[in-house]
């Protein structure tokens, strides 16, 4: 038995890293949802009565040691006490029932089934965290602190949880030079130049944040990968990250460039059926696993947007993926992205991934996962679910979501994305259940929005999307509202009235962005390359499917993309029980109307308005939604610290300006096409169309 502040002397390195990790000395957002702001009144008194001994079996396990340290951090904050007052009792003999005033850890209990599963049992006298493995105790600690941080009484906390999906992964689009593709929160957090000798303490805080929401895998580099990241010097760098993150239950993955045997291996080809190529990849995998025994595997973007792949040699995606899968063997996984479209394919771009991959169903190796974007186009503010979900019944598939807001405002304002992801997860595929039910046995990936900015995500509210991704990957049955309230209570305030206001802002924010950027199912109307701002007038890019005009198809007669049997027939890729709901404009959800149908401007909608009138009304609704958010946030000044309140106020001022820009530029363009007057009482665009067309942003971030 040991007593004192220190946890386990054998883990001094971990403790040192935790102490070195940057701590916010002001409310600057660095602490994210792990602020552990002091409780007040009876809530603090209830918790203080439990602030006695901590009994822990397996306390010398590094993950259990971290769980205890997280408990201490949380209690120190919630009770507003100095760390010097900590008292620890570490004992390998875990009491069968919790002593009074104690926290009890039982981290090797076979009665708790499932990897990462845990139970938290609270009473007025003790709180017990039980798990089958140390990682369950770490997750259980974060869950306990989440409940306490929302003001829950310890006696009322009764949790029994297991992750809904085994793989809960972040995909970083970070380049080794520090640039982040589609990144809007500064530079990359990965300091490759100084690894492996120097580990940035921020890597520990990053791991803490991920573990607190159940993220257990990280792809550290861009899918548009550099081959040299497979060289020995980078394997050594990756090993340092893997060693630091392992106690947090996080495995590292690499995006692999398919042509690496040719690029850095001295071979004349990267043909997956060439024995020398297969041998090169096998040797490379062996080299990585010798350094990192729990290496997760490779993520591959192949034959898409100029990236090399097996089709360069007349081979299929399955042949390419299976060659890599054989190299890795049972040690890890090959994650193969289904985001493909080709310049020489004149069919509807939204059909091409299905056409390429569905015929390959059942041909992929068991350790291959097909990673499918939420919709068939490209992370638009609203798309229908991807038709590949449910159509690959003999292939392991996972969902790819985008946490970074490439098409939803980038680094300005608020766009809470949990409702977007819930739309997809809850969608019935007509082929074996909802999207969530189909991907739950495998996993969910999110394109990260994390960068070097002090608050991690560029804006304070973008942290909610990182948080929501992790929570939904852990439990897709959670509602968007539940997650919003959880996050806001831990991030800003526990004041009930303020929480209701913040949650309402968040829940309406994505719909506002949809309305002022792409209402009624319009999509891909953004600026070229940087994807910032409106540009529905762009019609002359090299490839047709890069042009906004390709998608909206507006002229004086109408607007929209006919994807029914009379058009591209992409609707036929959905299950026969699902397609009919979108086949007739009269029964199509208005939110997807112009995604599936081309209609006359005078077409009458169920609202009683013409299509043109409804389109204008939606743009105005989007602007009004942002105005309401700004007013609601202004009302919260007494409840929010001045530093973050001012920062969000500035973000919303930018969003108000951008919403009007989108609205005005779009209406000016649609009027130039249809020749129609604005409905009575509608405010005209502030500038002529020519002024909007002249705006250029060569310096926009994230390109």
Model-derived regions: residue spans:
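C-terminal non-catalytic alpha-helical accessory regions
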Residues: 437-702
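Bacterial N-terminal signal peptides that target proteins for export
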Residues: 1-11
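Feature activates predominantly on carbohydrate-active enzymes
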Residues: 59-70, 74, 109-282, 290-297, ...
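Acidic, contiguous N-terminal accessory segments
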Residues: 26-124, 155
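Catalytic-core regions of glycoside hydrolase
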Residues: 266-485, 491, 495
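Structural motif
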Residues: 56-61, 90-96, 105-109, 130-132, ...
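Sec-dependent N-terminal signal peptides
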Residues: 10-19
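N-terminal signal peptide c-region/cleavage motif recognized by signal peptidases
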Residues: 21-23
């Amino acid at each position: 038995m040991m007593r004192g502040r220190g946890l386990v002397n054998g883990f001094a390195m971990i403790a040192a890293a935790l102490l070195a990790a940057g701590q916010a000395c002001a409310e600057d957002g660095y602490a994210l949802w792990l602020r552990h702001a002091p409780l007040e009144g009876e809530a603090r008194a209830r918790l203080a009565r439990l602030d006695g001994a901590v009994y822990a079996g397996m306390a010398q396990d590094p993950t259990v040691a971290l769980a205890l340290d997280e408990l201490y951090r949380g209690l120190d904050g919630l009770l507003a006490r100095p760390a010097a007052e900590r008292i620890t009792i570490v004992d390998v003999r875990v009491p069968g029932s919790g002593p009074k005033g104690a926290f009890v850890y039982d981290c090797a209990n076979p009665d708790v089934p499932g990897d990462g599963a845990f139970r938290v049992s609270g009473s007025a006298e003790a709180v017990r965290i039980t798990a089958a493995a140390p990682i369950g105790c770490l997750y259980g600690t974060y869950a306990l602190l989440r409940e306490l941080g929302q003001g829950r009484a310890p006696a009322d906390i009764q949790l029994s949880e297991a992750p809904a999906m085994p793989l809960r992964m972040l995909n970083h689009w970070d380049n080794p030079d520090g640039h982040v593709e589609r990144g809007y929160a500064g530079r990359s957090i990965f300091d490759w130049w100084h690894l492996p000798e120097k580990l940035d303490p921020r890597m520990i805080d990053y791991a803490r944040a991920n573990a607190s929401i159940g993220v257990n895998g990280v792809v550290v580099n861009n899918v548009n990968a550099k081959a040299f990241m497979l060289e020995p010097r980078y394997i050594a760098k990756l090993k340092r990250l893997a060693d630091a993150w392992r106690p947090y239950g996080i495995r590292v993955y690499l995006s692999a460039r398919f042509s690496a045997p040719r690029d850095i291996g001295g071979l004349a080809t990267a043909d997956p059926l060439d024995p020398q190529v297969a041998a090169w990849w096998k040797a490379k995998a062996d080299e990585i696993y010798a350094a990192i025994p729990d290496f997760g595997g490779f993520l591959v973007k192949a034959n898409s947007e100029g990236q090399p792949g097996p089709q360069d040699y007349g081979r299929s995606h399955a042949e390419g993926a299976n060659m890599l899968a054989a190299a890795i063997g049972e040690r890890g996984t090959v994650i193969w992205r289904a985001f493909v479209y080709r310049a020489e394919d004149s069919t509807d771009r939204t059909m091409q991934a299905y056409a390429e991959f569905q015929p390959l169903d059942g041909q992929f190796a068991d350790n291959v996962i097909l990673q499918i974007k939420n919709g068939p186009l490209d992370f638009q503010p609203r798309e229908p679910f991807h038709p590949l979900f449910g159509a690959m019944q003999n292939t392991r598939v996972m969902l790819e979501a985008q946490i970074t807001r490439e098409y939803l405002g980038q680094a300005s304002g608020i766009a809470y994305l949990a409702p977007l992801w819930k739309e997809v997860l809850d969608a019935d595929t007509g082929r074996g259940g909802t999207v969530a039910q189909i991907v739950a046995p495998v996993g969910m990936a999110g394109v990260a929005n994390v960068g070097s900015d002090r608050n991690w995500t560029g804006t304070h509210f973008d942290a909610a999307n990182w948080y929501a991704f992790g929570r939904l990957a852990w439990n897709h049955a959670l509602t968007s509202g539940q997650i919003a309230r959880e996050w806001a209570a831990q991030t800003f305030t526990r004041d009930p009235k303020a929480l209701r206001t913040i949650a309402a802002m968040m829940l309406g924010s994505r719909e506002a962005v949809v309305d002022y950027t792409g209402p009624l199912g319009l999509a891909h109307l953004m600026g070229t390359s940087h994807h910032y701002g409106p540009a529905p007038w762009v019609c002359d890019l090299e490839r047709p499917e890069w042009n906004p005009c390709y998608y909206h198809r507006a002229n004086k007669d109408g607007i929209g993309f006919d994807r029914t049997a009379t058009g591209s027939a992409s609707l036929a890729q959905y299950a026969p029980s699902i397609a009919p709901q979108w086949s007739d404009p009269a029964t199509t959800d208005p939110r997807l109307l112009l995604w599936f149908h081309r209609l006359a401007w005078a077409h009458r909608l169920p609202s009683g308005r013409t299509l043109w009138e409804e389109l204008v009304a939606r743009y105005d609704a989007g602007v009004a939604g942002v105005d309401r958010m700004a007013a609601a946030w202004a009302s919260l000044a007494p409840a929010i610290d001045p530093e973050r309140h001012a920062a969000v106020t500035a973000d919303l001022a930018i969003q108000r300006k951008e919403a009007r820009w989108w609205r005005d530029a779009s209406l000016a363009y649609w009027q130039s096409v249809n020749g129609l007057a604005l409905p009575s009482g509608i405010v005209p665009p502030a500038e002529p169309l020519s002024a909007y067309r002249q705006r250029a942003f060569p310096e926009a971030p994230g390109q």
